[in-house]
A protein has these predicted regions:
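Surface-exposed loop and membrane-interface regions of Gram-negative outer-membrane beta-barrel proteins
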Residues: 126-146, 152-207, 215-224, 329-335, ...
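Signature for the C-terminal beta-barrel architecture of outer-membrane proteins
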Residues: 201-207, 222-370, 411, 416, ...
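Flexible glycine-rich, low-complexity coil/linker segments exposed to the extracellular/periplasmic environment
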Residues: 369-405
Length: 492
């Protein structure tokens, strides 16, 4: 494209002199014979380049199967009596049309080389041993298995179709007289099935329609809950505008209930502040039109700010701050609750990549749940295994603390023991935000991740929870709780 553009610029300042020569004989008479010959040669060069551009345009249209205009089929004429403005306009139109057709051919070549279908998947099996009722001696052992196959179709460069089938079950959960012959497939379903349109009308606009995962920000409110044996997905519509910074607007149907549907609406902004720092303001609206205690109209809004800075020696210091508020109505109660989270991170530059995180999460509680005011914060649809300890004793908030809220002070450390092994230790101190007895207890989680090869990963975790008074009262036991797991995961 530089050749065409550069030539058109060169022609621009010469056109007037060349094309006006026949109308200005005085100039020719005063000019030398050599100058006249040079100008005539330049005029021929302009005409030759013009014809080359017209010929290239005709060939490009033929390659693309587009209709060739009659004026191109009969050959290419001379400049004739064209004025400088007319010739300049024609060259500009030719250049723009050639650029358009070249871009179109390049795009078609990329689409031809792009694979139309892509199949990926993951199969994982996890053994869990748990004694978490705070009464020693009655541990439970179960083997979980989850399999996913994901088909990605690309009929065009700007169109994708995603279909992901999932089977998630516990070993021995098949039913029937002889479970080994079970063929009911109760646990098989579509985890995701959606259409994605990109670059709508040539803009940075993307649309996703169908069953899909919704995961935003830290995951405190909306996460895929990938640790679960089924995972979470929503039936919804998402519009996204932008790339490096973007705005998402979505609606999801939680339950089809006729005229009393349960819906979730959301607006999420991811804005780049500067290198390494971002801000994410958002608001979610939950709606359930059912009358009575199930009636729901609750707005949750917040702001998340996070980033990191790297020193000259490679040391990384990061932070994440988030504040959230809730207001609305649940049943006949008024809602007014809040949550705050802060995390500070350090990562070293050595080959062991040591990382230390200090954090604090606070969820408001309610010590008078029958007074018509709900002050206990609800975490909506979180990525629950990510927060509040790996034992998952506080996965459903505020129910798991009896509306008492939660205060979690945490210290987490991780490092690489080798190129394929990473180890970590997480320690939590839990208390209630509201209540006569606030002490919940302390949890320690040890984790090891071993990457066997590029496709296979082995995870091990061992956890202990030592209860305090509030936990002993609510759970009815006073012994420490234990849990361990071993998970094998293969991706393809």
């Amino acid at each position: 494209m530089r050749r065409v553009t550069g030539w058109s610029r060169y022609v621009g300042w010469m056109l007037t002199l060349i094309l006006l020569m026949p109308a200005a004989p005085g100039v020719a008479q005063d000019s030398t014979v050599e100058t006249l010959k040079e100008l005539q040669e330049l005029r021929k060069e302009v005409e030759r380049r013009r014809n080359e551009m017209r010929r290239e345009l005709m060939l490009l249209r033929q390659v693309l199967g587009e209709e060739v205009e009659p004026e191109f089929e009969g050959g290419f004429g001379s400049l004739g009596g064209m004025t400088p403005d007319e010739l300049g306009a024609e060259l500009r139109i030719l250049r723009e049309e050639i650029e358009r057709l070249r871009d179109k051919i390049t795009l078609e070549q990329l689409e031809a080389r792009q694979e139309r279908f892509d199949i990926t998947g993951i199969v994982r099996s996890r053994l869990e041993w748990s004694d978490i009722d705070f009464v020693s001696g009655d541990a439970d052992v179960r083997q979980l298995m989850r399999s996913r196959i994901k088909l990605t179709g690309r009929p065009r460069h700007d169109t994708r179709v995603i279909v992901e089938i999932q089977d998630g079950r516990a070993w021995g959960s098949e039913s029937g007289v002889d479970p080994t012959f079970d063929a009911d497939a109760d646990h098989i379903d579509f985890h995701q099935a959606y259409i994605e349109l990109q670059e709508i009308y040539g803009k940075q606009l993307t649309m996703r329609l169908g069953r899909q995962e919704l995961a935003y920000g830290s995951g405190h409110l909306l996460g895929s809950a990938a640790w679960g044996n089924a995972g979470r997905a929503f039936d919804g519509l998402v519009f996204r505008y932008g790339e490096k910074s973007f705005v998402d607007l979505f609606v999801a149907k939680i339950a089809e209930q006729g005229v009393t549907d349960e819906n979730l609406f959301g607006l999420y902004v991811d804005a780049r502040l500067n290198d390494g720092h971002r801000a994410e303001p958002y608001v979610f609206l939950e709606q359930d039109k059912t009358l009575g205690v199930e009636r729901l109209l609750r707005a949750t809004g917040g702001l998340r700010i996070y980033g990191s800075a790297t020193g000259e020696t490679g040391h990384i210091f990061g932070y994440e701050l988030e504040g959230i508020g809730q207001a609305g109505e649940v049943g006949n109660d008024d809602v007014l609750s809040y949550m705050g989270s802060a995390t500070f991170r350090y990562r070293g530059p050595s080959w062991t990549q040591p990382e230390v995180r200090l954090g604090l999460d606070f969820l408001s509680g309610d010590d008078a749940p029958l007074d018509g005011d709900r002050e206990a914060f609800d975490t909506m649809y979180p990525a629950w295994h990510t927060f509040f300890g790996l034992m998952d004793l506080f996965r459903d908030m505020p129910e798991d603390t009896g509306n008492g809220g939660l205060l979690d002070f945490r210290v987490q450390g991780e490092m690489s023991a080798s190129e394929s092994v990473r180890v970590g230790l997480h320690v939590h101190h839990f208390t209630l935000a509201k209540g006569v007895e606030k002490g919940l207890g302390q949890e320690a989680d040890a984790i090891v991740t071993y990457r066997y090869n590029a496709a296979t990963t082995l995870h091990w975790g061992g956890m202990i929870f030592v209860p305090s008074d509030a936990m002993k009262l609510s759970r009815g036991g006073e012994d420490p709780a234990f849990k361990t797991f071993m998970q094998l995961e293969v991706r393809f």
